[in-house]
Regions:
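Accessory alpha/beta interaction modules
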Residues: 1-147
């Protein structure tokens, strides 16, 4: 009789969320990554997306601090499309916060600057730090994009 083994591929993701849903731990991580020394966890405005219905996207932890819209995500598989996924997450975060807030005004609506950090803990050999850019996916990468 052969038994089948079920592998839980989301345990690392859940552990990351459990640890860093605590504002004090999240602030400590932010300070370690940025070299800042924030002391008050209540300054964090947590705005994590649990499930974006139409895309079935989830993020691990997102928050606003000091005019930065931060998105932290843990991945055990390298994905060169991570910047595109981040673009979708940020669009939804901004939509939730700013939809209906005078976006048709003649005055510029200032928004927090996006910062997307992915923590890789997979088995493939990867550098300690690797920058991925959304523009790397553009079909005409040398052409300056304008919105």
């Amino acid at each position: 009789m052969q038994e089948s083994v079920t592998i839980n591929r989301t345990y690392k993701d859940r552990l990351f969320k459990i640890i860093f849903e605590d504002k004090k731990e999240l602030l400590s991580l932010y300070n370690a990554l940025t070299g800042k020394n924030y002391q008050n966890p209540d300054e964090l405005e947590i705005n994590t997306i649990d499930d974006v219905i139409y895309m079935h996207l989830k993020n691990d932890m997102s928050f606003i601090l000091d005019d930065w819209q931060n998105l932290f995500e843990q991945q055990s598989t390298f994905n060169p499309n991570q910047p595109l996924r981040g673009f979708f997450y940020f669009a939804d975060l901004y939509k939730v916060k700013y939809f209906g807030k005078k976006i048709y005004s003649t005055r510029l609506l200032k928004i927090p600057t996006p910062q997307y950090i992915v923590f890789y803990n997979g088995t493939a050999n990867m550098p300690d730090r690797k920058e991925l850019r959304l523009s790397d996916a553009f079909q005409q990468p040398d052409r300056k994009s304008v919105v």
